[in-house]
Amino acid sequence: MASSLEQATAARPVSGEPAMNAADAARGVPSRSRLRASRWPARLDLLQSLSGLLLALFLIAHMFFVSSILVSQQAFYTIARFFEGAAFLAEPRPWIVSCVVGVVMALFMLHAWLALRKFPASFRQYRIFIEHKEQLRHSDTGLWWVQLWTGFALFFLASVHLFGMLTQPELIGPYESADRIWTGNMWPIYLLLLFAVEIHGGIGLYRLALKWGWLQGADPLAGRRRLRIARTCFSLFFLGLGLVTLLAYVQLGIAHADRAGERYVPHKAASRLAGHERPGGLEFALSRRPGE
């Protein structure tokens, strides 16, 4: 009798919702309102994919910006001042960089929060996943496990870097960055950060392409193989570029260690100012520091 009462209650329409028949109620078929509510996990999953893609694109651009030190110290200095608004303001404004970093931090925290939904929430869930992974022995499942741990590491490593850029945006320059990396003993953190971010980003882009069917073609298996090759090439290229760039900053930091704290001054601008000749236009704006 209690079972009959429960079925009747479940089949009763609530707040204008169409009535469920007794057979559906007995089988436990969810109501339409519950089906509508179940769309939220899919929306959050889409938001996680979008935030991850935006962060990956930012990291690609960021790597090319910081690697400009391989071209010359002046090239990196010019790019740093450009992002402080030197090209269109009377003088560079480091707070512009802080604003950009703040947006990146917000996106980073959003992506981390969305990703935490899929982490094992208890030791029991962790054990179940490990058993599942060992039974399947599927490469993509293993990649997700690697991505989970690199993401966990990034939560701490990237936060240190972002906080420094947020609070001290004026200390971005050839000498300043090299001093922070070498004299400030930050190079181990940057080395770990480099491996974590490139491995995590490469796997993330690969899984995004698989999930949304990008670049797979008519043959899914052949498309998956192409994506694996692209993922490997992506990670190797940016790891190589990052290691060479970090080595360049370390070498500059070693050479500049006895003058740590000295700000970089462009040679051309310094010589002209010493000769009481001021460069004009965009060249002068890009060569100035705040307050000069």
PLM feature spans:
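Membrane-embedded alpha-helical bundles that constitute the cytochrome b-like, heme-associated redox core
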Residues: 2-292
